[in-house]
Design a protein with these regions (language model features):
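A transmembrane-helix-recognition feature enriched in membrane-embedded lipid enzymes
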Residues: 1-44, 351
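N-terminal phosphate/diphosphate-binding loop that engages ATP/GTP or pyrophosphate donors
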Residues: 64-124
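Conserved catalytic-core segment of NTP-binding enzymes
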Residues: 138, 150-247, 254, 266, ...
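Residue-level signal for inorganic ion chemistry
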Residues: 18, 59, 114, 148, ...
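Short, flexible loop segments at boundaries between secondary-structure elements
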Residues: 230-232, 282-287, 325-353
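Glycine-rich phosphate-binding P-loop
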Residues: 48-65
Length: 353
């Protein structure tokens, strides 16, 4: 944990009970339609969210679930809040069924990534996700909505609530914000239909399995799945230069990331056998500048690195600054397994899609 965050949580601990109460009352009001109304769409809604602050692999999971839906002949649309994007409309169409319409600085890095990875799938953002989701149904004929980061967005009813936990952070310190990483008290997990532990690997498998048993003991009626990240390929800043995973691993790299859980990225590089000479971290959703890139190149050269390596999320924002020094991105896919695929198919079988 970063020192500043640790201090914030220590100071904020006294306010955690009050924040917990606010979130409990809010959920109660939505659940009973008192002052706060939860609206249902004419199509199914799958929410992919988390209980904790920070990264739990929601974007790879949205990508994975959406591809499963496409394979089943479903016409999904993705709805997101669009954090980090400058598009300020009530409804922002990041991608229609033909192409990506907004650049990453307008769309937000995660929605842009999803639009690029899932051609033909409408991706929309906006703060009022009920309005945005209705537009996706009416304008694009979507017959299912995938809501990114939707667990706390109770204004939109959902038919399947998937709650993700990172195998590297799990529940953090177990306290509710501002004294810890939890967005809500643990009792909020009663709303979920299933849990997914993401990023399981050899370094955390035993801890993840222990946490899975704890979840199963506390919520015996809710299935718990786990998924692992697998390297899918390498993006290279020079579009005319192909680079395989094997070639990238033979190079000396300087890594950097501006994501919620940068340790996860650096750990993945180490586990996959990349040779890393140094690293740099930026805040989540960081907007890179030419000065940032120049400083990164200088640090990489000073460390003896032959190239910079970063995440997909960061890479898409760096295109205006590509130069002669190579910048690579490690692309990651989430692998779930047949049990999860069957669970999703079974859950959808009751809907006319």
């Amino acid at each position: 944990m970063r020192p500043l965050l640790a201090v914030l949580f220590l100071v904020g601990r006294i306010f955690s009970p009050a924040y917990s109460l606010v979130m409990l009352v809010r959920a109660y009001l939505y659940r009973n339609d008192i002052f706060l109304k939860s609206q249902r769409l004419p199509v199914p809604v799958i929410s992919i969210g988390n209980l904790t602050l920070g990264g739990t692999g929601k974007t790879p999971m949205v990508r994975y679930v959406t591809r499963l839906l496409l394979d089943r002949g479903v016409r999904p649309a993705i709805v997101s809040r669009g954090y980090g994007g400058k598009a300020a409309g009530r409804i922002n169409i990041i991608a229609d069924r033909t192409k990506t319409l907004l650049p990453p600085e307008m769309a937000g890095d995660e929605p842009f990534m999803l639009a690029e990875a899932l051609p033909g799938v409408p991706v929309l953002t906006g703060s009022q996700r009920v309005r945005v989701a209705r537009h996706a149904v009416e304008a694009f004929g979507a017959n299912l909505i995938v809501m990114d980061d939707g667990f706390q967005h109770l204004a939109l009813r959902r038919d399947l609530d998937l709650v993700l936990f990172s195998a590297r952070t799990l529940l953090g310190n177990g306290r509710v914000f501002p004294g810890g990483e939890l967005r809500e008290p643990l009792s909020a997990l009663n709303r979920a239909h299933a849990f997914v532990i993401t990023g399981v690997d050899s370094s955390n498998r035993s801890v993840a399995e222990d946490f899975q048993r704890r979840l199963q003991g506390s919520f015996p009626a809710k299935p718990v799945f786990s998924g692992e990240y697998l390297p899918a390929g390498i993006w290279h800043s020079s579009q005319d230069k192909a680079c395989t995973l094997a070639e990238a691993k033979s190079m000396e790299m300087f890594s950097f990331a501006g994501i919620a859980n940068p340790d996860s990225f650096h750990q993945t590089l180490r586990l996959e056998g990349f040779s890393v000479t140094g690293s740099k971290e930026f805040r989540d959703h960081h907007d890179y500048t030419a000065q940032d890139v120049a400083a990164l190149v200088a640090a990489a050269r000073a460390s003896g690195a032959q190239a910079l390596i970063t995440t997909e999320k960061d890479f898409v924002k760096l295109r205006p600054f590509f130069g002669s020094f190579p910048i690579l991105a490690l692309t990651i896919e989430l692998r779930m397994g047949q049990k999860f695929d069957l669970f999703l198919a079974d859950h959808l079988s009751g809907h006319a899609l």
